[in-house]
Amino acid sequence: MLEGCILAVSSQSKSAKAITNNSVPGAPNRISFAKLREPLEVPGLLDVQTESFDWLIGADSWRQRATARGDVNPTGGLEEVLTELSPIEDFSGSMSLSFSDPRFDEVKAPVDECKDKDMTYAAPLFVTAEFINNNTGEIKSQTVFMGDFPMMTEKGTFIINGTERVVVSQLVRSPGVYFDESIDKSTEKTLHSVKVIPGRGAWLEFDVDKRDTVGVRIDRKRRQPVTVLLKALGWTNEQITERFGFSEIMMSTLEKDNTAGTDEALLDIYRKLRPGEPPTKESAQTLLENLFFKEKRYDLARVGRYKVNKKLGLNTDKPITSSTLTEEDVVATIEYLVRLHQGDTVMTVPGGVEVPVEVDDIDHFGNRRLRTVGELIQNQIRVGLSRMERVVRERMTTQDVEAITPQTLINIRPVVAAIKEFFGTSQLSQFMDQNNPLSGLTHKRRLSALGPGGLSRERAGLEVRDVHSSHYGRMCPIETPEGPNIGLIGSLSVYARVNPFGFIETPYRKVENGVVTDQIDYLTADEEDRHVVAQANSPLDDEGHFTEDRVLVRRKGGEVEFVSATEVDYMDVSPRQMVSVATAMIPFLEHDDANRALMGANMQRQAVPLVRSEAPLVGTGMELRAAIDAGDVVVSEKAGVVEEVSADYITVMADDGTRHTYRMRKFARSNHGTCANQRPIVDAGQRVEAGQVVADGPCTQNGEMALGKNLLVAIMPWEGHNYEDAIILSNRLVEEDVLTSIHIEEHEIDARDTKLGAEEITRDIPNVSDEVLADLDERGIVRIGAEVRDGDILVGKVTPKGETELTPEERLLRAIFGEKAREVRDTSLKVPHGESGKVIGIRVFSREDDDELPAGVNELVRVYVAQKRKISDGDKLAGRHGNKGVIGKILPVEDMPFLPDGTPVDIILNTHGVPRRMNIGQILETHLGWVAKAGWNINVAGADGVPDWAEKLPEELYSAPSDSIVATPVFDGARENELSGLLASTLPNRDGDVMVNEDGKAELFDGRSGEPFPYPVTVGYMYILKLHHLVDDKIHARSTGPYSMITQQPLGGKAQFGGQRFGEMECWAMQAYGAAYTLQELLTIKSDDTVGRVKVYEAIVKGENIPEPGIPESFKVLLKELQSLCLNVEVLSSDGAAIEMRDGDDEDLERAAANLGINLSRNESASVEDLA
């Protein structure tokens, strides 16, 4: 049975929990405004990766889960492929080779060493190979090494050649049978068709055309009457009439069919499939059998078999054994198509089962499945093994039977190459997004419809990209990229899981006779369509009864209506069940427009880790689980007492007497150049529980995700400096390093063997002053701690130059001074243009130390340079609601607007950024941020008791101290009336004054004049993120640099150290102002007049006047292009004479030719004698 069923044992009371994070020991107490009790913990957020890989390698943990699910004798992915392949027989069938029992040895090196030394984190794979000589019955068994197999780390990633990569799950159309409906343009008739799509093999398509005949296409070849196929399968006219007598169109198709009997039908099919080949009955029979009924050639896959059985009502209660088509499948498919065309709504199959007759929606999640990491790797291994199978067969025929052993037959190269190719080059094996922990977590939970066997951006239409009702609780409707991939790449919802068939399931609470139970059933999209589902916030009493007579529910296709409580089958487990992790971290999501929420979810992944992380005052309760599951914090494995704490490690003495040492990552570089640093948050002698966070990572505080900073924001225009989403910042954020981040760059150089001799890493560099070498050590490598700027030498290296024949004097010098006099050139590693920082690490690998290095490389040096980037004009900031902007001005603290108690605001945002974008969540966050920062106390002791607005709040929320952290979960957070009440109940400051009014606004004073602004301004605390789009990475200037070889114009872009293009529109602007000489200069001597450039430089150096410009190189290129199109283009002077366009090289050529006495003019000499 597909439905997973678990019983959630709830330890919470029936009321909402006021404190989140209770399930994790030692977690900070975040006060929650949630009204609803969630009966189910959020599942492991990396399970989609880890469980799939466990299935592939047949891990014990997976076997236990499969057995608990009720699977009998579960088979792992590798085992499955080897079973499919075995036995490999030779062409005569006299010998065979079988494989079984895949197993792994220990991994070769730990994760850190693999990253350090550019190795792959892999374990050797061994299988048992058994060779059987069928003639003699002799069996030879051996354990065979099948190559190093990349293993998944605990975090769900792979280390390939030292870089961390993620394999993204792929969304594909499931194998199965799909019925479709279309309108014929000429006759406006409704036509129906059906495709039988296998996992591997030929497609089988049936359709009813406008002439009302039923046809079949085999393997996308020409259409034939469907009765030809039935006859080829051995059916007689009488049998066809008996089964399909109810259908006029089948009878008319039979009448038009001219084939008589099985043999003729087989030959007819053979002629269509193999035109030009002489047909025989045997070859036709074999062809048809091979196409659809032989496992080697046709594979529906288990999921395809399951889908076909389910759709056509066949053998639904029997376990799935075969994965080929059967004759009954073909017949039932034809009957279903015919009944669909004549308008029937149900069909009774031979077993007496009734199935609904309807067309399929291919975008429905019942028809789209996930290929997770395990299946993707399994498919790649299958490709490698099939290549190996060919080699084995060839060797069986060529080698001596007596001498054959499994080892001599097997060549593992194709398998190893296939695995390497997948991890190294596949579209689905991606360089891990390590900007911050959330970006890594989201990357592992990504669902992509692109990739091999999937869609392509160009062909994907609107329907497949659109949000579908079956996505509910399975794929997030919010989080998807902007741009050409919109809708093709999604993110798994928080509670979703993947079942053994690859379909995404989501959990629901079972409702029995109008009573909501704590039993949890996981449903696929197909199963959900058969049920009536109530929403998570439907009011319940303490016994679980619906308090209202009519309950709002949804049915198939997302249709919403009110029904009585007894009709309800299931209820959502949580209001955040439909969204992904990143979206679930947006507070007040319910008040944001979806387009802006999409930007908010995506921009959280671009936040850079700051020097000091700060958890949000206003969170959603998702921060803790996201940070722990992302794997960048250190979690205690066992309960115990902390023995020793330092910056580099924590030692815990566990209760069972074992000692655990947890090592910290210190200032490591992530894939995106951000700084990954871990620091302990426990003290020596402190007791820790199992699962408790003992050290923070990047972007975390006390184990919670902390992507940005809580800043005091004023929402108002300010002198036009925050026009069009520009942002005004206080200089305090610069001085106090509030928004400062550390970025680490890796620079690498290797010393190789060249044809002229070996390169050498040395301090002895020709033509370099001592000041330049000051920071290099005796090896020629920069010292740790050195401040470096662009152009500084990091590693000195010299490369031998090509040498001419030495004179006797030079030979004497060489004999006296040795290698010193050798000709070398400086090829040192220098800091790239525009970069600077402090050297924080050096790694040296050399052959002498037995380090593994690529062929021809003797030594390799890596230098890590860290840069501390303060916030500056041009950097991009954003909130969590899609409210993004670029810093337009950084004001001195004294000029910033300030509150009546003298507190200056940190950041000023423009009011225009809110109304038309409809992301009101940012305003509500600002209000609640102020409430959390100031603290509150609801007056419940007054005459009226608890105010009306606070009736739904738990007692724990009646008061809170200042600097409290709160959670407002998505779709279940603080209401507007509660916010108004809390704003009126905030605690006064130390002077006894309340700064912000009940409406969330405060009187602000202008920092420059001290005068109050004429209107109250919304002031509060907003969580602001510093994004990866930093101005330091974008700003660029060039004086001299590289040119394009063809056009002789400077290259473009920062990466090429290019120039600024003076384009077509800029030329128009110059023309409009009549600046003819400026324009001429720009188009010639400042750009691509090669001769003029040199002359101008010479004139400037000598202090002479600038000479006349020449002809630009691009003009010559244009002439050449026109001439290549066979157009005779000539350049005429003012008096009409043709001007010869020659390249500078041509002039040199002519001069050389004249010296040699060769004539290069058009009237060439007729013979060699004429030259003499």
Curated annotation (Swiss-Prot):
<dbReference type="InterPro" id="IPR037034">
    <property type="entry name" value="RNA_pol_Rpb2_2_sf"/>
</dbReference>
<dbReference type="InterPro" id="IPR007645">
    <property type="entry name" value="RNA_pol_Rpb2_3"/>
</dbReference>
<dbReference type="InterPro" id="IPR007642">
    <property type="entry name" value="RNA_pol_Rpb2_2"/>
</dbReference>
<dbReference type="InterPro" id="IPR019462">
    <property type="entry name" value="DNA-dir_RNA_pol_bsu_external_1"/>
</dbReference>
<dbReference type="GO" id="GO:0003677">
    <property type="term" value="F:DNA binding"/>
</dbReference>
<dbReference type="Pfam" id="PF00562">
    <property type="entry name" value="RNA_pol_Rpb2_6"/>
</dbReference>
<dbReference type="GO" id="GO:0032549">
    <property type="term" value="F:ribonucleoside binding"/>
</dbReference>
<dbReference type="InterPro" id="IPR042107">
    <property type="entry name" value="DNA-dir_RNA_pol_bsu_ext_1_sf"/>
</dbReference>
<comment type="similarity">
    <text>Belongs to the RNA polymerase beta chain family.</text>
</comment>
<dbReference type="Pfam" id="PF04563">
    <property type="entry name" value="RNA_pol_Rpb2_1"/>
</dbReference>
<dbReference type="Pfam" id="PF04561">
    <property type="entry name" value="RNA_pol_Rpb2_2"/>
</dbReference>
<dbReference type="InterPro" id="IPR007644">
    <property type="entry name" value="RNA_pol_bsu_protrusion"/>
</dbReference>
<dbReference type="GO" id="GO:0006351">
    <property type="term" value="P:DNA-templated transcription"/>
</dbReference>
<dbReference type="InterPro" id="IPR007121">
    <property type="entry name" value="RNA_pol_bsu_CS"/>
</dbReference>
<dbReference type="InterPro" id="IPR007120">
    <property type="entry name" value="DNA-dir_RNAP_su2_dom"/>
</dbReference>
<dbReference type="InterPro" id="IPR037033">
    <property type="entry name" value="DNA-dir_RNAP_su2_hyb_sf"/>
</dbReference>
<dbReference type="InterPro" id="IPR010243">
    <property type="entry name" value="RNA_pol_bsu_bac"/>
</dbReference>
<keyword id="KW-0240">DNA-directed RNA polymerase</keyword>
<comment type="function">
    <text>DNA-dependent RNA polymerase catalyzes the transcription of DNA into RNA using the four ribonucleoside triphosphates as substrates.</text>
</comment>
<protein>
    <recommendedName>
        <fullName>DNA-directed RNA polymerase subunit beta</fullName>
        <ecNumber>2.7.7.6</ecNumber>
    </recommendedName>
</protein>
<keyword id="KW-0808">Transferase</keyword>
<dbReference type="GO" id="GO:0000428">
    <property type="term" value="C:DNA-directed RNA polymerase complex"/>
</dbReference>
<dbReference type="InterPro" id="IPR007641">
    <property type="entry name" value="RNA_pol_Rpb2_7"/>
</dbReference>
<dbReference type="InterPro" id="IPR015712">
    <property type="entry name" value="DNA-dir_RNA_pol_su2"/>
</dbReference>
<keyword id="KW-0804">Transcription</keyword>
<dbReference type="Pfam" id="PF10385">
    <property type="entry name" value="RNA_pol_Rpb2_45"/>
</dbReference>
<dbReference type="InterPro" id="IPR014724">
    <property type="entry name" value="RNA_pol_RPB2_OB-fold"/>
</dbReference>
<dbReference type="Pfam" id="PF04560">
    <property type="entry name" value="RNA_pol_Rpb2_7"/>
</dbReference>
<dbReference type="GO" id="GO:0003899">
    <property type="term" value="F:DNA-directed RNA polymerase activity"/>
</dbReference>
<keyword id="KW-0548">Nucleotidyltransferase</keyword>
<dbReference type="Pfam" id="PF04565">
    <property type="entry name" value="RNA_pol_Rpb2_3"/>
</dbReference>
<comment type="subunit">
    <text>The RNAP catalytic core consists of 2 alpha, 1 beta, 1 beta' and 1 omega subunit. When a sigma factor is associated with the core the holoenzyme is formed, which can initiate transcription.</text>
</comment>
